């Protein structure tokens, strides 16, 4: 989703099970960064699809394989044809195992402009974690409200 000053920042809705899966993936892969794809509709995340982290240094970076990305695009097309749905890959997620859920310069540079991004910060507080959603707005990656739905 690309937003401009002519539109307001969106709320992003996420299914509770998808969010639970993302948190479990982040904890399981620590101290490496985890990563995955978000499937749903614009502004609505229905499913989190874990992918392997192909970065050369997975403790500091993440890289989603193009093979994983295109496999999910094909899967969404099959679902859409079979069920008359409009599912798509709408975003990506990754973790910062020792940090806050703030996008790094690399995160911003490599981000797809039409995606929603979730970052899980496992080091956000003592014993805790924080998740933030981001979308591009006037070509800047901006935080947006993340609403958990059942």
Feature locations, PLM:
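Conserved beta-strand-loop surface patch within small alpha/beta domains used
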Residues: 1-89, 97-150
């Amino acid at each position: 989703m690309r937003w401009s000053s002519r539109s307001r920042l969106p709320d992003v809705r996420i299914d509770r099970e998808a969010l639970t899966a993302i948190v479990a993936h982040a904890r399981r892969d620590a101290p490496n960064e985890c990563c995955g794809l978000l499937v749903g509709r614009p502004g609505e995340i229905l499913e989190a699809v874990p992918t392997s982290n192909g970065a050369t240094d997975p403790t500091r970076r993440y890289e989603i394989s193009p093979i994983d990305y295109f496999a999910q695009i094909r899967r969404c097309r099959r679902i859409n044809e079979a069920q008359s749905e409009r599912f798509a890959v709408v975003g990506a997620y990754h973790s910062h195992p020792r940090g806050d859920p703030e996008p790094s310069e690399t995160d911003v540079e490599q981000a797809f402009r039409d995606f929603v991004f979730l970052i899980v910060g496992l080091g956000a507080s003592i014993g805790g974690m924080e998740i933030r959603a981001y979308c591009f707005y006037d070509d800047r990656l901006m935080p947006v409200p993340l609403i958990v739905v059942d």
